[in-house]
Amino acid sequence: MSSRKKVMLKVIILGDSGVGKTSLMNQYVNKKFSGSYKATIGADFLTKEVLVDDRLVTMQIWDTAGQERFQSLGVAFYRGADCCVLVYDVNNSKSFEALDSWRDEFLIQASPRDPESFPFVVIGNKIDMEESKRMISSKRAMTFCQSKGNIPYFETSAKEAVNVEQAFEVIARSALAQEEAEEYGGDYTDPINIHDTTERDGCAC
């Protein structure tokens, strides 16, 4: 195993109240689903150890309240995030239309060093509902994601555990890449040439 230090990845889940943020988190971490979650007050988090490319990392997944009156709690929760997950309900057009403001809210509150490259993942949840109730097509959601810099997009059912594992695999990978970029980026903006052309003593083992 690698002797590199253990990595803690902070992931924030945002979206309107009732879109299934808590359900997604619980399905991924605990493999459980409940149809009777109460609205999250403030924020709550769960942790899960996962392997990303043979590297063991701990994901700290924050589930934040979707109610507007709790959005002011943001700064403390958003700071230090390595990835932001934007969740909407495919059967609720209002929750989809709110994604833009959730994304903007996150970028303002979290103040990532490089907002343009900060990793987001979009999840359209509740695909287990009747097709006739669906209000947001996959095409419309994908068009939105492409317009925001090709954000990865997943359609999930937290209830039936559809695509949840796959979505969080990409979330973990994106978060780790962001964490490493922050760790090694420092305050340098110019690329560093890692190929040293000078001769070195010793064997090339």
Curated annotation (Swiss-Prot):
The keyword Nucleotide-binding applies. Disruption phenotype: Displays highly fragmented vacuoles. The modification Cysteine methyl ester is found at residue 205. GO terms for cellular component: fungal-type vacuole membrane; late endosome; vacuolar membrane; vacuole. A lipid is attached at residues 203, 205 (S-geranylgeranyl cysteine). It holds the Pfam family Ras. Changing residue 22 to N: Constitutively in the GDP-bound conformation. Causes loss of function during vacuolar morphogenesis. One of its GO terms (molecular function) is GTPase activity. Keywords: GTP-binding, Lipoprotein, Methylation, Nucleotide-binding, Prenylation. Ypt/Rab-type GTPases are key regulators of membrane trafficking and intracellular vesicular transport. They act as molecular switches that convert between GTP-bound and GDP-bound states, and regulate virtually all steps of membrane traffic from the formation of the transport vesicle at the donor membrane to its fusion at the target membrane. In the GDP-bound state, Ypt proteins are predominantly cytosolic, solubilized through the interaction with a GDP dissociation inhibitor (GDI). This is Ypt/Rab-type GTPase avaA. It comes from Emericella nidulans (strain FGSC A4 / ATCC 38163 / CBS 112.46 / NRRL 194 / M139) (Aspergillus nidulans). The gene is avaA.
